[in-house]
């Protein structure tokens, strides 16, 4: 199949959140299944210094009253064809923000649509988050291109309809209050980045005012779990670590722990319980819970805590105050450093993710891969990836808590600290996490099956995993809706052939 990925981010060149990881890692996994996969993204200014981009574009077009150019290069890590939409609006270094953010990404979506119609026509156009939300609307009447829309974070929903009407052409049939709603309505298939998140967003608690619409389209909604690149994230070959290690030999983690304590200005002690956190410092990630429980945890246990990330100023200030008040035991770096992040994964004893909501989460997968035991809230993708530790039967890979409350988080932390004191059991807990298979190869099979479904292919893909479908609403029949959607596609193709 010919598949075109359209997104605002693509790791490693442009990465702000988990979407960048998905767009950087899923396409090569699909390409290994013999699909022709290509990517298109805005031509941000910094890309011209990172990639080998020809001077001359392969095509020029016009949309929304502006001319644009399409440049062709290749992804630096996997070699897949990468197209960049060139326009002065993308020249600044910034990815998000600014008064023209809505216009920038609506323009990108429109340019991508023109590219798909005039230059390289895919069978499946895979769109990611609101930045590409208008593409399914414009493609709705094209019988030859099917659209898949992936929800990475429902909270960010794009410009409202009245603003879209001022910026671009909105088809007469378009419904939906904003870009995200329109994408959900008009995409041929919709998926969330974990099965649990797919169920959660159909409730009022997590639906961000779109739960009614999501229940309405539940027949074409499913959850497919994200993965990680097992070659890029391999503690046995990670050159950024002072000492490499694997599930059979964890001795290198002690060297990494000492290096982490030294770099973060903590007291060097191999027996201290060292907790790590690598995160955007925003409300979603539960940083406020950490601020509320830290003093009590440090008073009750011999723990140390390290935090790496940037975000909201108030949360940054609170973490900085804790570091000042607890020298040698609490340390924070208000930046992002990939080498330091890897050292935290490979040197900390446990990893903190007390998220308010979590569509999937990548950090807990990386932490387990590197032998850092996750302490997480039971929400979203964390439910699907971190089974709770059972000391009786010696099962599970992490410590989980239910309510978004300081007392619940604190209790989980104390439970993990007490388990850490039983080193043999703790080592087995680490090893279970390190041997979990969360590769993109497994996820790619699920996406391949969804592509076949949306294109009307009846035969299952070879060795395809069973794709779980969710009947998330009341009064809806998922199989019937899928059949109806495919029937409409076939009808449009037939009409086009008769014309």
From Swiss-Prot:
Keywords: Glycogen biosynthesis, Glycosyltransferase, Transferase. Coiled coil: none annotated. HAMAP family: Glycogen_synth. It is an enzyme of class 2 (transferase). GO terms for molecular function: alpha-1,4-glucan glucosyltransferase (ADP-glucose donor) activity; alpha-1,4-glucan glucosyltransferase (UDP-glucose donor) activity. The lineage of its organism: Bacteria, Bacillati, Cyanobacteriota, Cyanophyceae, Synechococcales. Residues 488-499 have a biased composition (Basic residues). ADP-alpha-D-glucose binds at residue 15. This is Glycogen synthase. It catalyses: [(1->4)-alpha-D-glucosyl](n) + ADP-alpha-D-glucose = [(1->4)-alpha-D-glucosyl](n+1) + ADP + H(+). It comes from the Bacteria. GO terms for biological process: glycogen biosynthetic process.
């Amino acid at each position: 199949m010919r598949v075109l990925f359209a997104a605002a981010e693509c790791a490693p060149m442009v990465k702000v959140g988990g979407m960048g990881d998905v767009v950087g890692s899923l396409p090569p996994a699909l390409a290994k299944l013999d699909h022709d996969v290509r990517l298109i993204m805005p031509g941000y200014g910094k890309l011209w210094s990172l990639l080998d981009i020809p001077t001359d574009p392969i095509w020029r077009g016009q949309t929304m009253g502006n001319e644009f150019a399409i440049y062709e290069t290749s992804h630096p890590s996997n070699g897949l064809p990468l197209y960049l939409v060139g326009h002065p609006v993308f020249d600044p270094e910034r990815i998000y923000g600014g008064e023209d953010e809505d216009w920038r990404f609506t323009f990108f979506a429109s340019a991508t649509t023109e590219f798909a119609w005039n230059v390289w026509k895919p069978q499946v156009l895979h769109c990611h988050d609101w930045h590409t939300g208008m593409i399914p609307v414009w493609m709705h009447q094209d019988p030859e291109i099917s659209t898949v829309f992936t929800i990475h974070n429902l909270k960010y929903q794009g410009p409202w309809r009245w603003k879209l009407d001022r910026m671009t052409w909105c088809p007469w049939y378009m419904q939906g209050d904003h870009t995200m709603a329109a994408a959900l309505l008009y995409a041929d298939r919709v998926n969330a980045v974990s099965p649990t998140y797919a169920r959660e967003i159909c409730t009022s608690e997590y639906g961000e005012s779109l739960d009614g619409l999501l229940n309405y389209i539940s027949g074409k909604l499913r959850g497919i779990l994200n993965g990680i690149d097992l070659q890029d994230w391999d503690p046995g070959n990670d050159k950024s670590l002072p000492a490499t290690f694997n599930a059979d030999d964890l001795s290198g983690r002690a060297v990494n722990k000492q290096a982490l304590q030294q770099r973060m200005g903590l007291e060097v002690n191999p027996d201290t319980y060292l907790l790590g956190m690598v995160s955007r410092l925003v409300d979603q990630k539960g940083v406020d819970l950490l601020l509320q429980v830290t003093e009590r945890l440090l008073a009750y246990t011999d723990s140390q805590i390290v935090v790496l990330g940037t975000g909201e100023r108030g949360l940054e200030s609170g973490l900085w105050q804790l570091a000042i008040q607890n020298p040698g035991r609490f340390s924070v770096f208000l930046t992002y450093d990939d080498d330091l992040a890897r050292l935290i994964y490979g040197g900390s004893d446990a990893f903190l993710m007390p998220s308010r909501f979590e569509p999937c989460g990548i950090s807990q997968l990386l932490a387990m891969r590197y032998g850092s035991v996750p302490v997480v809230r039971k929400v979203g993708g964390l439910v699907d990836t971190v089974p709770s530790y059972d000391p009786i039967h010696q099962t599970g890979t992490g410590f989980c808590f239910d309510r978004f409350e300081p007392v619940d988080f604190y209790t989980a932390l104390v439970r993990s600290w007490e388990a850490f004191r039983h080193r043999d059991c703790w080592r087995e807990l680490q090893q279970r996490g390190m041997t979990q298979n969360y590769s993109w190869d497994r996820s790619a099979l699920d996406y391949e099956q969804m592509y076949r479904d949306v294109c009307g292919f009846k035969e299952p893909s070879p060795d395809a995993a069973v794709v779980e479908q969710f009947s998330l609403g009341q009064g809806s029949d998922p199989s019937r809706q899928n059949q109806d959607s495919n029937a409409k596609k076939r009808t449009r193709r037939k009409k086009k052939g008769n014309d």
